[in-house]
């Protein structure tokens, strides 16, 4: 078993195409985990092992790989860069202790890099910066360093300087040791020499070395004071200070190279060992009560403590059902019985494996700090806590974003329904941001996701992985409804047709609620006009109607109901009568309270070459976008805008056309906003048309 101080649980994350997966491949090659390097552009990379990943050259799932470097165990997670798969980045960050942020040497800080960086900041994950692709046309290491300061508000600590640039890039100077690492053109990582600093770089190396040491020593007042008085610190002292600053995110050690050409990778791996924290150095995960509130206890990373682990990913592959877990405390052995604190059920551990992407090694045991996969677990989902049955506990839960886009899918043949149902069940377990429901009116299966690419991939998996031939509907926007004014109203439910009748009268106030509160209910009834035992029925009845608004049948947001008074009948009143009264009150009062249709607004971040900025901004304006910010860079302009999701379908194609393929964008959900009347009328008409068509079937 590896000592905890020698564990490094790290993620690699960046913008699409900055070279995350290639960087991971090189790490595996250097650590001896793979013999033939797989290239993303050949569809052969080790961590991109889904068909869809290999074909599209992007990472969709977070693949966990274990490897060793200088007696240290690395558990490496290669995360997606595409915005539709940020849920994978989020849940990876939940179980990581450190990370490598990869940036393109020519593209710099691109839209999705910023999103992932923000997520990592929120999760307080220490990081190293790696500026990749310095062999590319237009690469500029120091420009990208400046962008990380200006755009990400990071404090990059330059550890190396490149020797040459673009097609003349051949190596790096290690500022601490004042040594030049120079590779030949064979593309083999081991083919390098250590030489003195090139004569034309001596001055700039000394300048940046002095900045490096001064910044590092800010972590230790005594060393800094001695340095100011002329005492040179040892390299070990400087490294210790850098490690302390990295752990608190005061600095981000910054390296550069070309992963594709195998240049600069060894220094990056050394930096993971030297500067990223081990599991014990990271703040322990909080434990919570049944309501999800922190209870003041923590999952201390300790091999001898009771077992605690978080299931952070479920995957069904050719090996069977795999549950990826991060072990925080204790040990786990084959044959052990563990408790799922969410379900309250125990399970016996049959097989455990250590993953090398799509290969795996059988394990007899695992311990705190490990990221492993358990084979064949039942009734476990992402975010569930697994623990010692004698010491039950719950780790802080994962929260996933709500889907903003949906499509309908129907099997082409009758026999496909059962196959599709089984497949979708597995896919939901694997991806918490993927939701499925059945349309009440049409009976169609509705897939919901985070964006067009997200759902494209899901449909592709259904067709190719599970062999379900599908008819796919047009993408639909997740509209919502709300109210705009406060009204007082009254509703009576009365039914008498022989036997015992039904009677319930409620007087109430309905008003717009605070944003993101959903539905809130309070009662101000004094006396016995509506007995207290019927109040929950009123709340239940009204709340049950919130899923279907009165404008176009979309879910309703942020409504407050106050029960003021009412009346009941000693014989005919019941909970069901008051529940029905509340449902009738909803239908009656929503239009009176100024019911309004809401549409999802997206934060859109676009990069445009200088020549195309006018076209791109004009196009965003036509899409009802509101431009919030423009920042000129060396290679183009970053434009930030709020744009309705309904206007963003097919945007990537339009952007590529306008910019000759050079434009890039990312988007994420921002908030709901009232629809203009013209849009509202169009949406209502489309809903009526669809329902009429379904009625004829």
Curated annotation (Swiss-Prot):
InterPro entries assigned: EFG_II, EFG_III, EFG_III/V, EFG_IV, EFG_V, EFG_V-like, EFTu-like_2, G_TR_CS
Domain tr-type G: start-end pairs: 5-280
Gene Ontology, cellular component aspect: cytoplasm
Pfam families: EFG_C, EFG_III, EFG_IV, GTP_EFTU, GTP_EFTU_D2
Principal localisation: cytoplasm
Gene Ontology terms for molecular function: GTP binding; GTPase activity; guanosine tetraphosphate binding; translation elongation factor activity
Gene Ontology annotations of biological process type: ribosome disassembly
SUPFAM superfamilies: EF-G C-terminal domain-like, P-loop containing nucleoside triphosphate hydrolases, Ribosomal protein S5 domain 2-like, Translation proteins
Alphabetically ordered keywords of this record: Cytoplasm, Elongation factor, GTP-binding, Nucleotide-binding, Protein biosynthesis
Keyword Transcription regulation attached: no
Residues holding GTP: 14-21, 78-82, 132-135
Localisation per UniProt entry: Cytoplasm
SMART domains on file: EFG_C, EFG_IV
UniProt cross-references to PANTHER family, sorted A to Z: ELONGATION FACTOR G 1, TRANSLATION ELONGATION FACTOR G-RELATED
Biological function: Catalyzes the GTP-dependent ribosomal translocation step during translation elongation. During this step, the ribosome changes from the pre-translocational (PRE) to the post-translocational (POST) state as the newly formed A-site-bound peptidyl-tRNA and P-site-bound deacylated tRNA move to the P and E sites, respectively. Catalyzes the coordinated movement of the two tRNA molecules, the mRNA and conformational changes in the ribosome.
Family of the protein in this entry: Belongs to the TRAFAC class translation factor GTPase superfamily. Classic translation factor GTPase family. EF-G/EF-2 subfamily.
Protein name: Elongation factor G 2
Source organism of the structure: Shewanella frigidimarina (strain NCIMB 400)
Source lineage: Bacteria, Pseudomonadati, Pseudomonadota, Gammaproteobacteria, Alteromonadales
């Amino acid at each position: 078993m590896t000592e905890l101080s020698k564990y490094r649980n790290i993620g690699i994350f960046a913008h699409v195409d900055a070279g995350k997966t290639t960087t991971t491949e090189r790490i595996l090659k250097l650590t001896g985990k793979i013999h033939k390097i797989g290239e993303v552009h050949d569809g052969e990379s080790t961590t991109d092992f889904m068909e869809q990943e290999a074909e599209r050259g992007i990472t969709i799932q977070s693949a966990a790989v274990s490897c060793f470097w200088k007696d240290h165990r690395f558990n490496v997670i290669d995360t997606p860069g595409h915005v539709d798969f940020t849920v994978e980045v989020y849940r990876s960050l939940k179980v990581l202790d450190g990370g490598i942020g990869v940036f393109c040497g020519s593209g710099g800080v691109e839209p999705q890099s910023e999103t992932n960086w923000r997520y990592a900041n929120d999760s307080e994950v220490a990081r190293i910066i790696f500026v990749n692709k310095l062999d590319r046309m237009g690469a500029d290491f120091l420009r990208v360093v400046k962008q990380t300061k200006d755009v990400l508000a990071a404090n990059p600590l330059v550890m190396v300087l490149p020797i040459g640039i673009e097609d003349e890039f051949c190596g790096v100077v290690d500022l601490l040791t004042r040594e030049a690492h120079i590779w030949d053109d064979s593309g083999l990582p081991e083919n390098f020499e250590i030489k003195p600093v090139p004569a034309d770089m001596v001055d700039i190396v000394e300048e940046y070395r002095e900045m490096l040491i001064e910044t590092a020593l800010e972590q230790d007042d005594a060393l800094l004071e001695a340095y100011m008085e002329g005492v040179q610190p040892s390299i070990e002292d400087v490294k210790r200070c850098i490690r302390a600053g990295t752990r608190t995110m005061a600095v981000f050690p910054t390296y550069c190279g070309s992963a594709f050409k195998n240049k600069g990778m060894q220094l990056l791996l050394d930096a993971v060992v030297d500067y990223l924290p081990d599991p014990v150095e990271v703040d322990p995960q909080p434990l919570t009560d049944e309501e999800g509130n922190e209870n003041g206890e923590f999952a201390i990373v300790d091999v001898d403590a009771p077992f605690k682990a978080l299931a952070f990913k479920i995957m069904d592959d050719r090996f069977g059902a795999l549950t990826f877990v991060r072990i925080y405390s204790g040990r786990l052995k084959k044959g052990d019985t563990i408790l799922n604190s969410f379900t309250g059920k125990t399970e016996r551990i049959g097989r455990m494996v250590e993953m090398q992407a799509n290969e795996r090694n059988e394990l007899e045991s695992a311990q705190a700090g490990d990221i492993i996969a358990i084979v064949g677990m039942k009734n476990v989902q992402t975010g569930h806590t697994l623990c010692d049955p004698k010491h039950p506990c719950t780790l802080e839960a994962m929260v996933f974003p709500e889907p903003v886009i949906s499509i309908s899918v129907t099997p082409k043949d009758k026999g496909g329904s059962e196959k599709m149902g089984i497949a979708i069940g597995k896919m939901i377990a694997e991806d918490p941001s993927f939701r499925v429901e059945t349309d009440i009116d049409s009976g169609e299966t509705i897939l919901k996701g985070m964006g067009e690419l997200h759902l494209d991939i899901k449909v592709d998996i259904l067709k190719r992985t599970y062999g379900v031939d599908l008819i796919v509907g047009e993408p639909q926007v997740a509209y919502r409804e709300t109210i705009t004014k406060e009204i007082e109203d009254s509703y009576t439910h009365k039914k008498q047709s022989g036997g015992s009748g039904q009677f319930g009268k409620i007087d109430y106030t309905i008003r717009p609620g605070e944003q993101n509160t959903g539905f809130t209910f309070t009662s101000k009834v004094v006396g016995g006009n509506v007995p207290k035992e019927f109040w929950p029925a009123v709340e239940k009845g009204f709340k049950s109607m919130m899923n279907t608004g009165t404008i176009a049948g979309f879910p309703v947001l942020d409504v407050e109901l106050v029960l003021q008074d009412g009346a009941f009948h000693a014989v005919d009143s019941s909970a069901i009568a008051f529940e029905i009264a509340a449902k009738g009150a909803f239908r009656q009062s929503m239009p009176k309270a100024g019911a309004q249709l809401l549409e999802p607004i997206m934060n859109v971040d676009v990069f445009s070459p200088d020549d195309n900025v006018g076209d791109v901004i004009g196009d965003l304006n036509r899409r009802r976008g509101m431009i919030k910010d423009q920042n000129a860079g060396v290679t183009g302009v970053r434009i930030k805008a709020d744009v309705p999701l309904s206007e963003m379908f097919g945007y990537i194609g339009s952007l590529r056309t306008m910019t000759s393929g050079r434009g890039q964008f990312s988007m994420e959900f921002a908030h709901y906003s009232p629809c203009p009347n013209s849009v509202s009328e169009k949406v209502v008409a489309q809903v009526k048309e669809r329902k009429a068509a379904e009625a004829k079937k």
